[in-house]
Each structure stands twice: as C-alpha cells, then as structure tokens.
Amino acid sequence: MQRGLVRRYFTMCCSIILTSIILLGVIFMVFAAQYFKEDKLGALEKNAKYAAEMTERYIISVDGRYQLVNNALLTSSWIPMAKALDADIYLANLSGDVLLCTHRSTCNHMVYGIEEEMIQKVKNNGCYTEVGKMGEIYKSSYYTAGVPLTLSDGQIAGVIFASSSAQGLTEFMGDILKMLSLIHI
C-alpha cells in the first residue's frame, strides 16, 4: 500500500514538473517570436527611413512631376544597408509600381508591384509593417517595413520598403519545438 502511494505521488510530481517545463517552453516561444518580430521590423523600418532620407537627395521636380536622377548611384548607396540586413530595399511610386530595387536576382517586386492597400497604409499611418508575403511578391514569409518618401515640400513622392526573410525565426522556433519534444519523451 505504501509503495503504491509513493508511486502515485512520484508520478504526480513528475507530471507537474513536465507540464511546467512545457508551459514555460511555450511561453518562451511566444516571447521569443514577439521579440524577433519587433527587433527585425524595427531594424527594417529604421533602415527604410534612412534609405528614404538618402533618396530625397536624388529626386528633382520637373514641370510639377518628380523624377529620380542617377538611379545607379542611388541603388549602389542602398546596397550596403540591404546586405547588412540581408534584406531587399525597394522604391515604389504611389501607384504601386516598383522603380528601384536592390534585389540580386529576378525582381518579383517589379513583376507584381505593390498593392494599393499597402501604399495607402503608409500614406495614412506613416509606416507599414507586416510579416507575410507582401501580396504575391514572396513565396514564404518576410518581415516588411514601408515608410513614405516625403520631400522637402511635404509631398509624398513614393514609398520605400525593406523586406527580409523570416526563415531565421522559423528555424529558431523549430529548434525550440525539437527541444520541447525531447523533454516530453
């Protein structure tokens, strides 16, 4: 009788400890995912703002219309930021057409363009952030931040977006799940 009672208490204590570890693991995953997201989106937004400041120097007004001058020099000034973040930086006009991009291979940004809804969110809120596929542009999840390209006269001439793959978060979460499943076994 005493053996059965000890065994029952031991089993109950083990299950409480195991449940606590799993619960703490899940809470850790939620906080880690939120931290990853906020950190990455913050860095992308900061660099998109910096790219917008740089871009403003390359825009002139001709007969009331804005034009980019020296696209190659502008793009080459964006590339160090893009490489440091492992991101794509691209400029879209207010119609959603992508005018410039740092993407290193075939550019889906120019093929699909930016959805009007995203452009409107930037114009209305001063910023746009998402973890998603940017409409049809990306095949997997990307962190994306967009900021308005506001000229010295206060006009919004376009939107600068910075996007980076969310694959690192996916791998991290997978590793955490593996660790939790090992604890469970």
Where are these regions (language model features)?
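Glycine-rich acetyl-CoA-binding "A-motif" of GNAT/NAT acetyltransferases
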Residues: 156
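Acidic surface patches and DE-rich sequence motifs
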Residues: 93, 136, 151
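Extracytoplasmic/periplasmic sensor domains and loops in membrane signaling proteins
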Residues: 76, 103-140
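Helix-start (N-cap) segments at beta->loop->alpha junctions
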Residues: 150-153, 161-180
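A short beta-strand signature within small-molecule sensing/ligand-binding domains used
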Residues: 138-150
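Juxtamembrane segments flanking the first transmembrane helix
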Residues: 2-99, 103-106
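Amphipathic alpha-helical bundle/coiled-coil segments
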Residues: 82, 89, 143-146, 163
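Conserved small/polar residues in nucleotide/adenosyl-binding loops
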Residues: 183-185
